[in-house]
Design a protein with these regions (language model features):
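Nucleotide-state-sensitive switch-loop elements of NTP-binding domains
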Residues: 2-15, 20, 24-148
Length: 148
């Protein structure tokens, strides 16, 4: 990937309600990433697991080939996605990753996040791959699972 352009970054969105295990799943993926690759993670908020602190030890961003950025200003899917766009563009520019993982809040609907990622601006930059939805099997019978 040249310094001038960012193209076709394999991108996965990891969704699920709060407590479904999104952060834990992302940590697992990051711990098994190829050593020669740079991965970026865009998170809506740092959850109980704490991807940033757990994996990166706080101040050594990028030293393990992992860059984490939090979306400031609330939900990724709110306010036309502007906070998400700002954080994503900054993360891509800084990290120049080989793969991008996105963890939206468990409170919003991922369709708004996917709409931002499918916008013209990101068409050549991102290669959207599978959207992974995690489900807490203990709560599968709750109405919200059927509604979303």
């Amino acid at each position: 990937m040249s310094q001038a352009e960012i193209v076709d970054i394999p991108t996965n969105v990891i969704t699920g309600f709060l407590g479904a295990g999104k952060s834990t799943a992302i940590l697992h993926l990051l711990k098994h990433k190829p050593a020669n690759e740079r991965w970026a993670v865009l998170v809506n908020e740092f959850g109980e697991v704490g991807i940033d602190g757990e994996l990166l030890g706080g101040n050594n961003r990028g030293e393990q080939g992992v860059f984490v950025r939090e979306v400031a200003g609330g939900c990724m899917c709110c306010a036309s996605g502007f906070p998400m766009q700002i954080a994503l563009t900054s993360l891509l520019s800084e990290a120049r990753p080989d793969r991008l993982l996105i963890e939206p809040t468990g409170l919003g609907h991922p369709k708004e996040v996917l709409a931002v990622l499918n916008a013209d601006h990101y068409q050549s930059m991102l290669d959207l791959r599978a959207t992974i939805t995690l489900v807490d099997a203990r709560k599968i019978r709750e109405p919200r699972y059927a509604e979303h």
